[in-house]
Amino acid sequence: DPDDFVHVWGMSKWMSLYEQMCNEIPNVVILASNEEMVAHMRIANWKAPIYNISGLSFGKEEVQSRVEQKPFMERKNRVVFGARWDQEKQPQFFMDMITKFKEKHPETEFAICQGGPLRSNNDYYVKEAKYLEKQGLLTIHENLKKNDYYNILADSRVLFNCALQDWTSNTVSEADALGCNVLFPAYRSFPEVFANDHTRLYVPWSQDDAMAKLELLLSKPSPSMGQISDWTNGTIDRMLDIMTGKGEQWRRDGSHYRTPVSEPKY
């Protein structure tokens, strides 16, 4: 993965040795979180059987029990960025879009939500974000506890993602479970996560397409809202099925292991 922090920041040598060690352990079964991860592991010549569980472990009911949700049309006209502010998450794309979108829709609020202080592996992005905040274009929420973040999501309309380095994300399940629209690039595993829903996936890296879809998703809830979190809510069940020999449909062996890539999972 050319954009993964393990590769970019010089950790690939020791990580590759660790993976080689795991690859030699007998009776290991690999549970990958998506079809693209399966492909990377197959290319790396993993010997163990590989299964695609198609999602991260997620408890929808537990997340929803933490906060009170507002009806969509009573929520703030707010777009949330919930990923790290590191360069592989493409914060510049988000900030450029904010500047352009606000010219036409000055009433829209854009927010960065972070569990600690706003930081990045490139300080320029932190300085630029703080500059936009001073200009009144962006709000930075720092040092959030999980429930604080959930309360913001439950009063927002769109969670936006523009990451180069992302495979599947708990942030999308959280936002979807809390009644927030989600808008992600049609990149890597996200077509699988979104079951190829073109209304919530934009052309990477087209600001025009992202903004056109953002306008629509700010105006009304997606008819598919809740389906992503329903699907990831079953990830643990899929894992248990595989471990007990009942999940062979998720095994990715042989020359046709890429066939299911285009098939919607739900």
Model-predicted segments: where are they?
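Membrane-proximal helix-turn-helix segments that form the acceptor-binding/catalytic region
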Residues: W9-I30
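Short beta-strand->alpha-helix junction loop in the catalytic core
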Residues: E36-M37, N52-R66, G116-P117
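Conserved donor-binding/catalytic core segment of Leloir-type glycosyltransferases
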Residues: K70-K89, M95-I98, K102, A111
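Glycosyltransferase donor-sugar binding loop
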Residues: E109-V126, I140-E142
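Aromatic "clamp/platform" in nucleotide-sugar-dependent glycosyltransferases that forms part
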Residues: A163-Q165
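Short hydrophobic beta-strand element within catalytic cores of glycosyltransferases
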Residues: N181-F184
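A charged, aromatic-enriched C-terminal amphipathic alpha-helix characteristic of glycosyltransferases
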Residues: S219-Y266
